[in-house]
Amino acid sequence: MINQPTMAEHFGWQFHPFSDTWRIDPPFYSQRDQRLADQALQLLQYGKSFAVTGPSGAGKSTLIEHLMSNLDANYYLKVHIHYGGLQRNALLKAIGEQLGVETNTRAVPLLVKLQKHIAAIATAKQSIHPVIMVDDAHLLARESLMDLCSLIVCPPKKTAAASLIILGDDMLAKQLNLALMNPIKTRLTVNFPMEPLSEEETEQFIAYRINQAKAPKDLFEPDAMALISAHCHGHRRQIMNVGTLLLAEAYYQKQKTVSAQLFMGCDLIQ
């Protein structure tokens, strides 16, 4: 269309509230999120390891990535594996590359090299504590989980050499409850369950993103907010997706706000 205003011009925002191309820092924290983050930080300070489990899109990665990004680099060495579905040796290589360990030599098994390297870091005069975070950990083979557990102990000092954070969906929580996973589960201080947002928290989540995007506060009418809350059941990624579709529909219809009527008439929302 000729002289069609952009979405930013039409709605009067600086950023799209639900865009994936810019990062909100800090992310939205519910009260439960804040408690989880505070407790997780305390555990890391004492060399502990833990899991965070919950439905895909619940906000696990966002919360822990923000926690990791704020760890003091003078005391912590961060290792982030974004995908737990790597083969056993590929996982060790990915960790080695982030630690600066040569991964192509065959004289010494890579797992042994990593164990020695991490132990050396832990026993150095100015020691630093590695924190290994693995996302999509429900895809990890049991052998890979055992490898990871072997990296977090320091036999010379009989103390923790590193901390392990594994993030996964509800399948990971079920896996950890199996008897054959007990050697792994006992090395984790706790499994934090990441719960969906309540309806009130969903509205707070949307309002927070609108505020961070410098968008009009009344972008979503109250009845539309209530419908989004009921439809998405507190699932953050779905809230983002539904919000994106509704704003696109409002833009197409030349509406400045998202109403309940617009929500009900949007055939792309399933």
Where do the protein language model's features map onto the residues?
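Conserved AAA+ ATPase "SRH/arginine-finger" region at the nucleotide-binding site
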Residues: 81-84, 176, 189-202
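Conserved NTP-binding/hydrolysis module of P-loop NTPases
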Residues: 13-18, 76-78, 86-105
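Conserved Walker B catalytic segment
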Residues: 49, 119, 126, 130-166, ...
